[in-house]
Amino acid sequence: MATASPPFISTLSFTHSSFKTSSSSSFSPKLLRPLLSFSVKASRKQVEIVFDPDERLNKIGDDVDKEAPLSRLKLFSPCKINVFLRITGKREDGFHDLASLFHVISLGDTIKFSLSPSKSKDRLSTNVQGVPVDGRNLIIKALNLYRKKTGSNRFFWIHLDKKVPTGAGLGGGSSNAATALWAANELNGGLVTENELQDWSSEIGSDIPFFFSHGAAYCTGRGEIVQDLPPPFPLDLPMVLIKPREACSTAEVYKRLRLDQTSNINPLTLLENVTSNGVSQSICVNDLEPPAFSVLPSLKRLKQRIIASGRGEYDAVFMSGSGSTIIGIGSPDPPQFIYDDEEYKNVFLSEANFMTREANEWYKEPASANATTSSAESRMDFQ
């Protein structure tokens, strides 16, 4: 797996107000506990810094309601890839119709929830800069949605340990929202069903309902129509994710999309082929690649170089969602030029594999954290 050279520790974003209460207790700097993990390969090292507020969150949850059967919760929030993505038309509401095979993968964030003494506001903190911690964040939107639908008056303190980069086409924010809905339901004693959570979630994001599948699904409409599927691939099939520092604006990608230049392959044919034959380059069609490559020409060059340098090591190389992550399925390792070329010194790298979940359980965190990058700056700055 790709690992990184020893970086300096960059500043973590943190909202101190998130840890103030009306009681005599207050936030202590001792709660900032950088966790360092090192691994070495090809003379490179990885340093991962994670803000860990466990002690504070645990105390708050216990103090709020000692009788509550569950007062705090730690959940894995995995991202997804689009194995294929067809854009089939434009709707009257301005959205596009799509048909896509979504699959959850083992790269993800960790979110910690605790009951809050507040009766009016959720408090969110995170370990990276550039991620909003107010009502713009999908986690807060999801919690507000849950209270609106159920009448619950419970609020939460949340810490988001972010590993999935933003602007990557991986659905990290959508996964966070789905995870928050699941957590709110658990911390309220399971007031509603999974199906209800899934139905509600489409009100705040088209990709969110997918995460209430079992991990693999054929999604249509805006993405909110979810047909659960059995896993079409071995779950241990490895892949590598390579995301350049530049992000693709989803709005700009769709603005440059020309429906007369999209693939003419029936998405149901793609689904049948991938189910029967597994992953191949011909199956991993993404109609958003041409407009994304127009927005970010270096992304097209990156994909071409990975295919050329892989020498058959990857079963397929393709872009996920609206970009800017390029996926290579079949190997967890990036091509050597990613290490050698100065142009790619700040890319985000992660190995991953497919994953699913059991009914009435959330996604389980993998035994090891696989995300890594080739610099501290790209590791810590997700803007």
Swiss-Prot record:
Reported phenotype of the disruption mutant: Albino phenotype and seedling lethal when homozygous. The phenotype is caused by an early arrest in chloroplast differentiation.
GO cellular-component term (any) = chloroplast stroma
Point out the signal peptide segment: none
The keyword Transcription is annotated on this UniProt entry:
no
Regarding tissue, the record states:
Expressed in leaves, stems, flowers and siliques.
Q: Where does ATP bind?
A: P165, T166, G167, A168, G169, L170, G171, G172, G173, S174, S175
According to its UniProt record, where is this protein mainly located? Answer: plastid
According to its UniProt record, in which pathway does this protein act?
Isoprenoid biosynthesis; isopentenyl diphosphate biosynthesis via DXP pathway; isopentenyl diphosphate from 1-deoxy-D-xylulose 5-phosphate: step 3/6
Is-annotated flag, keyword Plastid?
A: yes
Which conditions up-regulate this protein?
Answer: Circadian-regulated with a peak in the late period of the light phase.
Protein EC: 2.7.1.148
Q: Where does this polypeptide localize?
A: Plastid, Chloroplast stroma
The processes (GO biological process) annotated in the record are: isopentenyl diphosphate biosynthetic process, methylerythritol 4-phosphate pathway; terpenoid biosynthetic process
Query: What does this chain do?
Result: Enzyme of the plastid non-mevalonate pathway for isoprenoid biosynthesis that catalyzes the phosphorylation of the position 2 hydroxy group of 4-diphosphocytidyl-2C-methyl-D-erythritol. Is essential for chloroplast development.
Q: Which PANTHER family match?
A: 4-DIPHOSPHOCYTIDYL-2-C-METHYL-D-ERYTHRITOL KINASE, CHLOROPLASTIC
- Family that this chain belongs to: Belongs to the GHMP kinase family. IspE subfamily.
Task: Tell me what this protein is called.
Answer: 4-diphosphocytidyl-2-C-methyl-D-erythritol kinase, chloroplastic
Q: Which organism is it from?
A: Arabidopsis thaliana
